[in-house]
């Protein structure tokens, strides 16, 4: 546990805080002892991940410069629904962070079985993770041990240095990942792009494995030639099922990134005629509350249920919410790319649009540029 020696040396953790009336370290320790330990073995929340985030703030950073973005619980639970995780699945999270995906997957699995033997087998064999940063690896390991995992299958290693063919031998049926963001700075670090992490994970899974990743929307665009080539390689070997655009404020609070969830099927080449789902899930039933963060509203359950019914083809939806389309590697794999607003404008919208156009036309006339309005003109 030497990774946590920094706690002893951080003045912000060990000096009395006027608002708390004690040191933050003492406050957190007492809170964990009184509030967390009694319930941590059964809660669905990644509580240790939350406390890690608070410690990082007091230690002088938020982790974002390193691309660290912790995944909220309502997102990890949504992954379990979209990927339809069962007790028979073998899950891999190659960028495990504090273990939030694995915690949600564990809860989903053990709540679906009855005997202690089945639950023990799941905890000891069906949950696997890789994490590069030692401090988060320690938290993830602790997270799993506190939940009764007697054989934590976590490895402190660099996922991108792992041979996909070797990982395939472990026959992972589900992949879940929130890769580091924005680590690609130049040509030398191009291999650190989010889409490269996605391909590496897909290549590492078993045949027909389900894979879900949460990445910046820009990763689905193909920001440069290298990323576009990776998208092409992905479709040669794997199938894109769909992409769900999320609300940046209610997914990654204060990160400044607008994310999306992409769902794939591994080692099944993408059929040219396949129509993928592209969903706009910005209205997710959560809100951003000042001084609190992300807050669940009374609409959250209904919005999630609506999303899942659309995803499972149990419900049709207007194109402003969901579009089904064939794709190409050069496309931007996002709802905003495929969506065309074919709704008729109401009277007020029509008047505003016409007013704006007439103002634009009048300005051209006043500048003696009315020739630009005529059809067939070249503008040399």
Predicted feature residues:
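Conserved S-adenosyl-L-methionine
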Residues: 65-174, 182-184, 188-191, 195-196, ...
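Short, functionally important structural connectors and interaction interfaces within domains
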Residues: 61-62, 124, 232
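A conserved structural/catalytic subdomain of Rossmann-like adenosyl-cofactor enzymes
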Residues: 166-169, 174-380
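S-adenosyl-L-methionine
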Residues: 45-70, 77, 81
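Long recognition/docking surfaces used for binding and targeting
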Residues: 1-59
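Conserved aromatic-histidine-acidic binding/catalytic patches
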Residues: 16, 20, 39-40, 64-67, ...
């Amino acid at each position: 546990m030497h990774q946590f020696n920094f706690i002893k040396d951080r003045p912000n953790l060990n000096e009395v805080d006027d608002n708390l009336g004690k040191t933050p370290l003492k406050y957190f320790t007492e809170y964990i002892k009184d509030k967390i330990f009694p319930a941590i073995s059964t809660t669905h929340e990644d509580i240790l991940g939350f406390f890690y985030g608070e410690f990082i703030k007091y230690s002088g950073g938020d982790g974002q410069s390193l691309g660290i973005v912790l995944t909220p619980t309502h997102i990890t639970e949504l992954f379990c629904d979209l990927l339809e995780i069962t007790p028979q699945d073998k899950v891999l999270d190659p960028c495990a962070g504090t273990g939030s995906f694995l915690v949600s997957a564990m809860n989903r699995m053990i709540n679906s079985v009855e005997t202690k033997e089945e639950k023990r087998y799941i905890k000891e064999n069906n949950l696997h993770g890789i994490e590069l940063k030692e401090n988060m690896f320690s938290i993830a390991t602790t997270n799993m041990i506190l939940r009764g995992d007697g054989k934590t299958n976590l490895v402190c290693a660099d996922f991108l240095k792992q041979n996909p063919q070797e990982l395939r031998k472990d026959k992972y049926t589900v992949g879940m990942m929130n890769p580091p963001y924005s680590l690609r700075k130049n040509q030398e670090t191009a291999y650190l792009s989010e889409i490269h992490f996605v391909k590496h994970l897909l290549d590492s899974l078993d045949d027909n494995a389900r894979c879900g990743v949460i990445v910046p929307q820009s990763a689905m665009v193909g920001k440069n030639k290298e990323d576009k080539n990776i998208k092409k390689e992905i479709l040669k070997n794997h199938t894109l099922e769909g992409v769900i655009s999320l609300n940046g404020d209610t997914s990654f609070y204060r990160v400044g990134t607008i994310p999306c969830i992409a769902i794939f099927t591994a080692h099944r080449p993408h059929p040219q005629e396949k129509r993928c789902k592209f969903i706009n899930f910005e209205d997710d039933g959560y809100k951003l509350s000042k001084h609190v963060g992300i807050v669940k509203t009374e609409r959250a359950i209904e919005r999630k249920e609506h999303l899942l019914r659309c995803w499972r083809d149990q419900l049709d939806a207007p194109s402003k919410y969901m579009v089904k389309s064939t794709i190409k590697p050069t496309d931007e794999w996002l709802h905003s790319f495929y969506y065309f607003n074919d709704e008729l404008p109401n009277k007020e919208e029509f008047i505003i649009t016409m007013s704006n156009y007439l103002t634009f036309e009048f300005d051209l006339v006043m500048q003696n540029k009315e020739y630009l309005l005529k059809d067939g003109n070249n503008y040399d």
